[in-house]
Amino acid sequence: MIPNHILILGSPNSGKLRIANLISKNEEIPNLEDVESHSGLIVKTSLRTKYYFLKLNILIDEYSESKEATDEKKLSELHKWYQEFKSEEFGELREVLDGLMFTINMKTDSISFIGDALEIIEQIKISLGDEENLHDWGGFIAVVGSCPENQIVEDDLILEIEDMVLSQGLEFINLSTEGENEYKEKQGKDRIVELIESHDWTNLEMLKVDSKQYETNKLAKMESMKQKLINEKEELDLDDIFSKLNLARDHAQSLTQDERDKYANKVIEEIIDFL
């Protein structure tokens, strides 16, 4: 089977290996912590859900190899990385990529640096599209914020970073969280897993679904919904649903038409699961 590819790009100590470990569940990855540079690492893994099976190559790269690099130096190195990435030499890599995760260290990366870096990420996003249709790329891009172990980042700073990322039409994921937020949306580590599992992959093998089990699950969900509708003591959480829809609509304003269609389908699936 032809493998799929995603790229995790970031500076040293920004959570790249943690993300790769989360996706692959590979116990060997932590042994790479002592490697001097993570540039060029490839983690080969596979993914199986109840619907499909696929092979996945997780490409890890660093645009700066020094933890002590200044913001100016990191930006210069990131821009240099982008110039190489968009060159003809890397055309084959761009063609096979299904996703990009850009990692930042929310404790050490300044707001100014993050803002400038996001502008370069936007250029990387454009380079992944077709020359005639700049946004005709079926992959995903997420900005993942991490924090060193046993350290805390202020909530106000996290919100400021999230707003900056969303204003660029990109998704922000805080690696320090997990579970669901108040709107029943997956967040943090669980959102990364959901993003990977729900993506429309280029190469995969569909698995046969047990039709009887599917019907059983469907009937059980319908019965649960019916009970919520007829039982006054059961709340349907309509306020949560409307809040989710309003948030989704606001987020969709910053997306292209093609991205809106995919995002709308994803939100609909989440609401159905929520019900």
Swiss-Prot record:
InterPro entries: Irc6 (IPR034627). Keywords: Chromosomal rearrangement. Gene3D superfamilies: 3.40.50.11960. GO terms for biological process: vesicle-mediated transport. Transmembrane segments: none annotated. Pfam families: Adaptin_binding. GO terms for molecular function: protein-macromolecule adaptor activity. Involved in gross chromosomal rearrangements (GCRs) and telomere healing. Belongs to the IRC6 family. This is Increased recombination centers protein 6. The gene is IRC6.
